[in-house]
A protein has these predicted regions:
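Extended, highly charged clamp/arch subdomains and adjacent linkers
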Residues: 1-26, 45, 68-72
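Conserved phosphate/pyrophosphate-binding and hydrolysis machinery centered on Walker-type P-loop NTPases
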Residues: 2-7, 30-33, 84, 88-91, ...
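Conserved, well-folded catalytic cores of nucleic-acid-processing
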Residues: 16-20, 46, 74-81, 86, ...
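Gly/Thr-rich phosphate-binding beta-strand-loop-beta motif of the actin/hexokinase/Hsp70
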Residues: 21-49, 147
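A glycine-rich phosphate-binding loop feature that marks nucleotide/adenosyl-phosphate handling sites
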Residues: 30-34, 88-93, 112-119, 160-173, ...
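Short glycine-rich, Thr/Ser-proximal phosphate-binding strand/loop in the N-terminal lobe
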Residues: 42-62
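Conserved phosphate-handling catalytic cores of large alpha/beta enzymes
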Residues: 63-84, 89-192
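Accessory alpha-helical DNA-binding modules that contact the DNA backbone or grooves
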Residues: 190-326
């Protein structure tokens, strides 16, 4: 029974981590509460925090008008696209307030599962990441980032706090931890990580990337803005050719300059991918579209014609069919 339960947790965790990201948006995270006020944080499309605030629109203070002004000012100042509301205490009340505030704007709102956000806010990792923020501000950031890139944010939290199952504390903790850790690695290897939203915790799971390299990638992104292509990684401090070769197939870019940068196809196989597409009458522009028909291919024959290994071809086709977790 225990093994079965661990299996169920692993499956639930995998589903949570594979949830679709919401890329390219500016998001306002809203951590709802009553007495202590609602904490707000605005993040840009790379997850960088632009501003935080605290408002009291709920009971007992009911400062709805003042709160509305703060929220509308933030929306205007940063061109906010979406508000992510945590689903904890005062979530329903917050939802009503938000719906009312944004009714004359093009902003949308989404309720986000905030399980584990408070555990993260009080963690050593959050202290390192946001030394100057209080726990409420950290929670609001975490809620916004969960909507933007669930995988990047959830890997910061002990899987047992994300609420993936009941009675997990009665189990063999070593087995449970190994199983859940394995899930994260598998997801990272299967779908890759978005180079422009990945947290340092997530980058640590990528082959070849150490803790310090992960921090350097984040610093580079904060200073220079989004990565436009994978090759830019070579500009990151202490990230040499060898590390690039190890990690390049697992880091992806949304809306990249080179369409293959949004797949887990390794740059070393780009020529092979282009040759294959060309042979089948497609171009790079067809990637991810419905035009691309890649079923029932004769891999042996293609392998001979293109001088590319069968396994490499199969991997390329698998990726061309599904760039990432959309």
């Amino acid at each position: 029974a225990e093994e079965k339960s661990i299996e169920v947790f692993a499956k639930n965790l995998s589903q949570l981590l594979m949830e679709s990201p919401l890329s390219g948006k500016t998001i306002l995270g809203w951590d709802p509460a009553f007495r202590t006020g609602c904490k707000l944080a605005v993040i840009d499309s790379t997850g960088k925090v632009l501003e935080t605030s605290l408002i009291y629109p709920t009971e007992p203070q009911n400062k709805v008008k003042e709160s509305e002004k703060v929220v509308l000012d933030l929306i205007k100042k940063y061109d906010v696209d979406v508000i992510a509301i945590g689903n904890g205490t005062a979530s329903r009340e917050s939802e009503e307030i938000v719906a009312n505030i944004i009714k004359n704007t093009s902003v949308e709102y989404i309720i986000v599962n905030e399980a584990g956000a408070s555990v993260y806010s009080a963690s050593k990792l959050a202290d390192e990441e946001f030394p100057d923020f209080n726990e409420g501000e950290r929670s609001a950031v975490s809620i916004a980032r969960r909507l933007q890139d669930p995988l990047a944010e959830l890997v910061k939290i002990d899987p047992k706090s994300i609420g993936v199952g009941q009675y997990q504390h009665d189990m063999n903790q070593k087995q449970l931890n190994e199983s859940l850790g394995g899930v994260v690695e598998r997801v990272v290897n299967e779908v890759g990580v978005d180079l422009n939203t990945a947290s340092s915790s997530l980058l640590n799971y990528v082959s070849g990337i150490t803790k310090s390299t992960a921090k350097n990638i984040i610093s580079y992104r904060e200073e220079n803005g989004k990565f436009d292509n994978r090759k830019e990684l070579l500009n990151v401090k202490k990230l040499g050719k060898k590390t690039f070769e190890q990690c390049a197939g697992f880091v992806k870019i949304d809306n990249p300059q080179h369409p293959l940068d949004n797949t887990t196809i390794h740059p070393e196989s780009y020529d092979a991918a282009v040759k294959l597409l060309d042979k089948l009458g497609y171009t790079l522009a067809d990637i991810g579209s419905n035009n691309l028909k890649l079923d029932n291919l004769d891999y042996e024959e293609l392998s001979d014609q293109l001088d590319i290994g069968v396994i490499t071809l199969q991997d390329i086709v698998k990726e061309l069919k599904k760039p990432g977790r959309d």
